[in-house]
């Protein structure tokens, strides 16, 4: 019988099948193989004894939080209160993309901007769209509802960015108040935190920490450049160009010619050297 692990507490694994939820245990062979079942794992279970027999190959695996097989991550990014931070956004995009997860940028609190601020932010919003990212603002939530059906979705962003508002728009029946996400999805405010998937109208949500908790690993730094969609790596003189100070670098040329947003490039350099 096939299923997906939606909760892990101690050595007990809650597996959602097509028919029901089953409380399962893991075979010792996984420990001997150095393999630990994770929330999000697609598994084969012994229908009679409720043991996990096999863990299917993972499409991705995050270390913090410990979760596997995320399809999409909604990056809820505030434009005001708290103010927009391009570095936090770009760092999250890199982290998500490098883990084979599709990022969707959700710009929140657009309605709080002045006309002058909207002009400035429209340029930035359109830039991200034009280089190939899926982008929505807080007047377009209905666009993603159908797209998310059946997917495992992470929801992340700064504190106060508007995650509750986003969930309310996607699933109005939740009627969330600010900071009530965990409670409404089934997790009490004062319970021990653990990663868990919640089925909300056919969308599996995983509650994740904010931007600061998702850090880049040192070994990933060589691949950071591939997460910047607009970087033309093939145009550089050297195949292993890092786009920092090499001669014949097409990316540096594109920045100087304003084909690449300078703030994006500066954020890239900061991530590479930090």
Question: Which residue ranges define each predicted feature?
Answer:
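SH3/SH3-like beta-barrel fold
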Residues: 13-17, 24, 45, 52
């Amino acid at each position: 019988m096939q299923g997906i692990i939606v909760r892990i507490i101690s050595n007990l694994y809650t597996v959602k099948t097509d028919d029901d939820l089953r409380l399962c245990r893991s075979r010792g062979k996984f420990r001997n193989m150095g393999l630990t079942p994770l929330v999000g794992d697609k598994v084969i279970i012994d229908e009679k004894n409720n043991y996990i027999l096999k863990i299917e190959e993972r499409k991705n695996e995050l270390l913090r939080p410990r979760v596997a097989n995320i399809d999409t991550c909604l990056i809820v990014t505030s434009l005001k209160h708290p103010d927009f931070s391009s570095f936090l956004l770009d760092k999250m995009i890199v982290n998500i993309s490098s883990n084979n997860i599709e990022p969707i940028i959700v710009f929140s609190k657009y309605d709080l901007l002045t006309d002058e601020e909207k002009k400035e932010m429209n340029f930035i919003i359109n830039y991200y769209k034009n280089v190939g990212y899926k982008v929505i603002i807080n007047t377009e939530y209905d666009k993603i509802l159908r797209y998310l059906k059946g997917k495992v979705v992470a929801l992340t962003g700064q504190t106060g960015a508007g995650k509750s508002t986003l969930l309310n728009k996607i699933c109005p029946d939740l009627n969330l108040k600010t900071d009530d996400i965990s409670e409404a999805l089934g997790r009490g405010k004062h319970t021990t935190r653990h990663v868990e998937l919640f089925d909300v109208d056919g969308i599996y949500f995983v509650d994740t920490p904010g931007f600061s908790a998702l850090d880049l690993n040192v070994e990933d730094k060589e691949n950071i450049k591939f997460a910047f969609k607009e970087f033309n790596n093939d145009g550089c003189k050297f195949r292993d160009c890092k786009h920092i100070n090499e001669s014949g670098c097409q990316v540096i040329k594109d920045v100087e010619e304003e084909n690449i947003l300078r703030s994006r490039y500066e954020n890239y350099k900061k991530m590479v050297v930090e």
